[in-house]
Curated annotation (Swiss-Prot):
Keywords noted in UniProt: Ribonucleoprotein, Ribosomal protein
Gene: rpmI
Gene Ontology CC annotations of this record: cytosolic large ribosomal subunit
An individual GO BP term: translation
MF-aspect GO terms: structural constituent of ribosome
Annotated organism of origin: Blochmanniella pennsylvanica (strain BPEN)
Protein's UniProt name: Large ribosomal subunit protein bL35
Length: 65
């Protein structure tokens, strides 16, 4: 049986933590930032932990990570 391929787009977007959770960077921080408040931009700069509902999907995309 052949090996399962890793989805490269997912491997570039998600990193696994020491506890086995997946962290990712928020979207909406590239351009059109003048209408966003400073507080909103500050929260977007921080990394987030992936919710459990998406965990099975991401584990299919990243079988060896």
């Amino acid at each position: 049986m052949p090996k399962i391929k890793t989805l490269q787009a997912a491997s570039k977007r998600f990193k696994i933590t020491a506890l086995g959770k997946y962290k990712y960077k928020h979207a909406n921080m590239r351009h059109i930032l003048t209408k966003k408040s400073t507080k909103h931009k500050r929260h977007l700069r921080q990394k987030s932990i992936l919710p459990k509902i998406y965990l099975t999907t991401i584990m299919k995309y990243l079988p060896y990570i």
